[in-house]
Every structure is written in C-alpha cells, then in structure tokens.
C-alpha cells in the first residue's frame, strides 16, 4: 500500500532534510525508568541528518505544483487550500502513562514505549502505511464524528449486500435507472463535458440533487415531489400540473405571460414555506435522507460492477454515465469513495473493451499495463520530496503506520531480551524509518546495547545502501555496535545465503505490509526459507481485508466496504475542505482502489488477506503464534490517546492486535516463531 510507493522517492538528499542545530550538539546518555517524557525527548535529537525529517507540521513548498492528470479541478482546489488547513487534527495530547514496574525488564519496556511516544510527536519515524476489516469490540462509544452515509449504509439493518458477497441479489436496478433518467429535467441545465467527472456542476448542486428525492424544498410536500421525480409517467405529471392550475383559479383564463408570472410567484412562495418548515424538521430526517442517497450510490456501484462482471458492457456504461453525474472527489466521504470506485470501474471497462475478443472476458495484462496500471502510477507527483510529504500527512494524521511499527518493534525488543548479538532482517527497508525508535530502546537497555546487525531488503540496491548509511550514522551517535547489510532483490528472488546468517545471533524477521504483494506461487517458498533460518521472532503486519478472492464482484464489495471506513477516518481527522486530505486520497488510496478493481493477473498486486487467512498460511509453514504482550497493548492505547478522534478501535484476537475505525478493522499485527 503506502510503503510500496514510498520507496519510489529513493534516497533523500541531506540538504532536503536539514536538522535543527541542537541535533548536532547533543550526545547520548543512558535513561532509566524514572526519566520523564521531557528527559526522554533528548534521545530523539540524536537522529542523523538523513533520518531527521522536517517538523511534522510543515508547510508544503509554495512552488511545488501537484496536478493529477485525471481532472483539472485538482489544480485549482490545491492552490486555494494548500496553506490553509494542514494537519488540523494531528496528535497534540500530552499523555502521562502509568509508572514503570520495578523490574529492569519492565523498566526497559516502559522506557521504550516512552521513547516511541516521543518519536511519534517528533516526526523522525517512517512513511510506510498499511491499509485494511472485521468487527471490533470496544467499550468505548463513539464521541466524535458519526459514520459517513456510505459506511452507515453498510451498517444498516436493511442492508442486504453484505449477506451474500459472491451471490448478490440486487434490487430492481432497471427501475432504479429509469428513476435516475427521470431526472433529466433537473440536469438539463448542467453542461455535460468529456471530463473525467462528466459534468461541470457545482458541488452544492450535486449534493442537493442526491437528496432531492426526500427533500421538501422544491415545492408542495415530500410525497408530491417524490411523485414528480420518480413517477416517470406523463399522465401523473399532467394531473399534478392541472391541480396546480386549478389551485391558482384565474390562471386558466389569463394570458400566457400572466400565467407564467403567477406560476413563478407560486413556486417562490412554496419554496419559502418549505424553507421555513425545514427549520423544524428533526435532524434524524436529514440523516435518513443522507443515508438514502448513500444507498442509491451503493445500488448504482454494485449494479455497475455486476454488469461489468457479467460482460454486459453497454449496461455498465449506462450506470457509469449516471454515476459520473452524481459523484465528486470533493464531496463528503460517501461521494469521494464512490468517485474513486467509479473511476476504477471506468478503467476496468475501458481496458476490457480495448482488448476483449468475442470469447474473452478477462483483462489482458498487456492492456492493463498501458491503461489502468499506468494510470495508477501517473497520479503520483514526480518530486520525491513531495511524495514523502504526502506520506508524512498520513503518518501524522492517522495512527495506522505508527501502530504497525511500534507493535512490531515491541515484539522484537522483547524477543531480544538479554541477547548480546542481534540480527534484524527487514523485508522492506525503504528509508529505514521504523528503526530509530528501536535503536534508541536498545541503547537504553541496562548493561548497554547489544551488537546490532540489520539486513535491509529492497528492489533498488542504491536506495538500500543509502538507508544503511543513515542508520549507521544514527547507531554511531547512540554508541551502538552496528552493521548494515544491503540486499537489492525482490522477495520472490531471495536466497538463503543473502541473509549472511551467523552463529550466535538472535534473529528477527520483520515484514510490514509486504507479504501480500508476493505472488502466490512464491509465497510458500519464501516462508519456508525464513523458517529454515530459525528466527527467534517473525513480525507480520498486514491489511485486514480480503481483496484476493476469486470473484471480481466479491472483491469489489469488500473493497467498497473497506475503503469507506478509511475515508470515514480521514473525514474525522481533516477539515471539510482539506487539500492535504484530498492529496492523500487521490495519490495513495485511489491508486490502490484502481489496482484492486481495474487490474487482473500479474498487474493486480494489492492482494490483501484477512488475519485468519494469514494464520492458516503461517501455521501451514510450521510457524506458531506468539501472543503480543500487555506492554504492546498498553503502548497501542497510549498511541491512540494522542489522537483527538474517538473513532479508532483496538481489539485483541487470539494474541494478535487489530486497529480499526468504528466497527471495521483496518490493520492487523501478529508475531510468530518456529
């Protein structure tokens, strides 16, 4: 997910990441369990220049222009908002954790948790992210923002779509489509263009049109307007027009100009009455209208996906035409996520029609590489620093990345207790941002730090070497005996000798949001090779989602439910019209959605699996689960306490930890041994 594309920034030049002058003058001193958070902050300033990221609350460069080739509206939107509302809900709370226990071991864990808490506020940790499902139980009730309309649709007791994932029994979609086509009069004043969103309608107009079905602001009563919009039959409309003329009395015999004047006056009067009445309407009615419009979007999306799956391409194009008229990437979370899925369905349909023969319904990999896949890659800024800043937005605003790194680090730290020589194999090292907090914790261990060796794996050997140089500088400043070994290979091409295993070393293998990208025919061999290395601990963090099913329609529904939760959490974190949030959605999550929906075969690399599936895979290869410790749970709760949003939920599942938003898990962390 995020970490897969963050590596595209390669190594960052030191001149781009200048540290504070105080960073150069501080030296390391050992910390005991009685240190306060203020004392522990001194540890973090030891980060070398290459790893010391700018302040988390940075301002994006004014001369950097980020433009998506998919729609020209992004340029104007970003220019208007870029400097206004960045990171408004970033973690700012001061947490006073419980006092450390008396034992030196627990003191180390306490010290470690404190160090990582401070690091989460200082910004020297990584831009690597995992996206992700499942019910979460929590005694915490939601205190902040409620569910978005789309997420509320999925949680509605009337929702029938989650009951049959692969065998969907859709409602009368044809009738529903006719209802939409009955709104032509409303959209006739809208100029339709060939842009990506197929219209030039203001966002407020689109939002009004979605709720028009249950709105009373356009005259008479709710029932009368519903009849006008959805009756579709000319006789009922003529009858209602006759009633209007009958109520006006003298209009029938008046001249045409007088009739028009009277009609306009009556419409204005009815609108004023409706607006006055709307002030007394309970809030629940607005929620129901919002939910109903969300249900309409879900119906259209699922109907379009079903048409694509069945090869009914003309019908699919009709649905896409309707969707493009009512979705927008700048609306509420429901409309924004629907916009991403609409664009993805369009990409899949276009690629299919381009390469489809009369008997083939499956996408050809060659067509995808020139259409949907290239589209995913082309949306990212070419400036590596701009890409890094976008990932920093996610890293600070949401706890998902911190949770992944801190939970994995805690498990490795505990597995290395009392070891004098330790070796960590990171299967996706990137810029190495996971390891500064871990190295600080080792440096604070009673009796001194052990000898640490890190083997970093990545596709670009030069980038991995640069990461090793940065980590070596940090280890030197912390006075940790350190060695870095770079490996520039894809995971499926790894060989045992590349790990350079040594006798007497305690070994940990770390994989954060990486194994789901390994092709299925290579995953078993990779896990067997890791097992043969006899590691003390294997940390596995992955998205809690099932995007690798055999049926397109099931994957589509799962992704729609999953990413609606992601967009909901972003909605609760950022302001309503937030340029940083729009960047995160367009440059990170939209490409993921396109890959899941539009790609097939080797081009589909986002093959997320649920925790239960990973359990079967790991146990099938001879691994046994290691329950995450209470320290890891406490640490995660401290982390969530740093965020102002109350929608995040933490739950335990057979020794594993899952972090989610509301009732949907997003990311799952587990630990394993041979």
From Swiss-Prot:
Record's keyword terms, sorted: Cytoplasm, Nucleus, Transcription, Transcription regulation
GO cellular component terms given for this protein: cytoplasm; nucleus
One Pfam family in the UniProt entry: GRAS
Intracellular or extracellular location(s): Nucleus; Cytoplasm
Stretches the record annotates as Leucine repeat II (LRII): 466-497
InterPro entries: TF_GRAS
Motif interval(s): LxCxE motif: 302-306
GO molecular function: DNA-binding transcription factor activity; sequence-specific DNA binding
Stretch list, region SAW: 598-673
Gene induction: Induced in roots during colonization by arbuscular mycorrhizal (AM) fungi (e.g. Glomus versiforme). Regulated by DELLA1 during mycorrhizal symbiosis.
Region (Leucine repeat I (LRI)): 295-372
Location of the motif VHIID: 422-426
Position of the signal peptide: none
Stretches for region VHIID: 391-456
Region (PFYRE): 507-595
Function: Transcription factor acting as a central regulator of arbuscular mycorrhiza (AM)-related genes (e.g. AMT2;4, AMT2;5, EXO70I, STR, RAM2, LEC5, PT4, VPY, BCP1, SCP1 and RAD1) required for the morphogenesis of arbuscules upon symbiosis with AM fungi (e.g. Rhizophagus irregularis and Glomus versiforme). Promotes directly the expression of RAM2, EXO70I, STR and RAD1. Not necessary to enable hyphopodium formation or hyphal entry into the root but essential to support arbuscule branching. Involved in the phosphate-mediated suppression of AM fungi colonization in mycorrhiza.
Subunit structure: Forms homodimer in nucleus and cytoplasm. Interacts with NSP2, RAD1 and TF80.
Family: Belongs to the GRAS family.
Protein name per the record: GRAS family protein RAM1
Biological source species: Medicago truncatula
Name of the gene this protein is made from: RAM1
């Amino acid at each position: 997910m995020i970490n897969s594309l963050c590596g595209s920034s390669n190594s960052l030049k030191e001149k781009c990441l200048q540290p504070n002058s105080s960073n150069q003058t501080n030296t390391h001193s050992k910390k005991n369990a009685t240190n306060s958070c203020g004392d522990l902050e001194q540890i973090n300033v030891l980060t070398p220049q290459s790893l010391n990221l700018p302040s988390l609350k940075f301002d994006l460069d004014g001369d950097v222009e980020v433009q998506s080739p998919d729609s020209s509206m992004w340029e104007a939107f970003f220019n208007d908002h870029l400097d206004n509302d960045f990171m408004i809900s970033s973690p700012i709370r001061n947490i006073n954790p419980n006092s450390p226990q008396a034992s030196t071991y627990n003191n180390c864990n306490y010290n470690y948790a404190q160090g990582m808490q401070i690091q989460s506020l200082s910004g020297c940790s990584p831009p690597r992210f995992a996206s992700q499902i499942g019910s979460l139980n929590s005694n915490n009730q939601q205190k902040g923002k409620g569910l978005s309309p789309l997420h509320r649709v999925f949680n509605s007791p009337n929702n029938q779509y989650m009951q049959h994932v692969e065998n969907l029994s859709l409602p009368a979609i044809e009738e529903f489509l006719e209802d939409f086509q009955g709104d032509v009069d409303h959209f006739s004043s809208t100029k339709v263009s060939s842009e990506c969103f197929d219209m030039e309608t203001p966002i407020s107009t689109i939002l009004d049109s979605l709720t028009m079905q249950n709105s009373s602001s356009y005259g008479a009563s709710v029932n009368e307007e519903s009849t006008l919009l959805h009756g579709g039959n000319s006789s009922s409309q003529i009858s209602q027009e006759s009633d209007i003329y009958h109520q006006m009395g003298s209009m029938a015999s008046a001249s045409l100009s007088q009739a028009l004047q009277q009609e306009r006056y009556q419409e204005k009067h009815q609108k004023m009455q409706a607006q006055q009445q709307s002030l007394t309407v309970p809030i629940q009615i607005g929620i129901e209208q919002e939910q109903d419009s969300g249900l309409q979007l879900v119906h259209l999306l699922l109907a379009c996906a079903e048409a694509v799956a069945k090869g009914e391409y003309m019908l699919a194009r009709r649905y896409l035409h309707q969707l493009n008229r009512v979705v927008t990437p700048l609306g509420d979370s429901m409309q924004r996520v629907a916009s991403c899925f609409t664009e993805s369905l369009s990409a899949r349909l276009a690629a299919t029609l381009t390469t489809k023969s009369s008997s083939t319904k499956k996408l050809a990999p060659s067509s995808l590489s020139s259409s949907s896949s290239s589209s995913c890659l082309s949306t990212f800024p070419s400036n590596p620093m701009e890409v890094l800043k976008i990932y920093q937005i996610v890293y600070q605003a949401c706890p998902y990345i911190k949770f992944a790194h801190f939970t994995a680090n805690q498990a490795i730290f505990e597995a290395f207790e009392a070891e004098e020589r330790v070796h960590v194999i990171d299967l996706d090292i990137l810029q190495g941002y996971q390891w500064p907090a871990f190295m600080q914790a080792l440096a604070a261990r009673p009796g001194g730090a052990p000898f640490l060796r890190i083997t970093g794996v990545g596709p670009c050997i030069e980038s991995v070497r640069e990461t090793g140089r940065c980590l070596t500088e940090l280890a030197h400043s912390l006075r940790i005996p350190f060695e870095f070994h770079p490996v520039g290979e894809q995971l499926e091409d790894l060989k045992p000798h590349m790990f350079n295993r040594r006798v007497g070393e305690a070994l940990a293998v770390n994989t954060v949001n990486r194994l789901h990208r390994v092709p299925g025919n290579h995953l078993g061999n990779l896990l067997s090779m890791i097992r043969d290395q006899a590691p003390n601990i294997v940390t596995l963090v992955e998205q809690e989602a099932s995007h690798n099913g055999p049926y397109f329609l099931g994957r589509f529904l799962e992704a729609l439910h999953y990413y609606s939760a992601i967009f909901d959490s972003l909605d609760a974190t950022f302001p309503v019209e937030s340029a940083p949030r729009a960047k995160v959605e367009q440059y990170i999550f939209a490409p993921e959605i396109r890959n899941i929906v539009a790609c097939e075969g080797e081009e589909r690399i986002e093959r997320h699996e649920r925790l239960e599936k990973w359990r079967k895979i790991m146990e099938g290869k001879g691994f046994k689960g290691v329950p995450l410790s209470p320290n890891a749970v406490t640490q995660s709760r401290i982390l969530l306490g740093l965020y102002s949003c109350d929608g995040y939920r933490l739950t335990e599942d057979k020794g594993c930890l899952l972090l989610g938003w509301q009732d949907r898990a997003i990311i799952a962390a587990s630990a394993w041994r041979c």
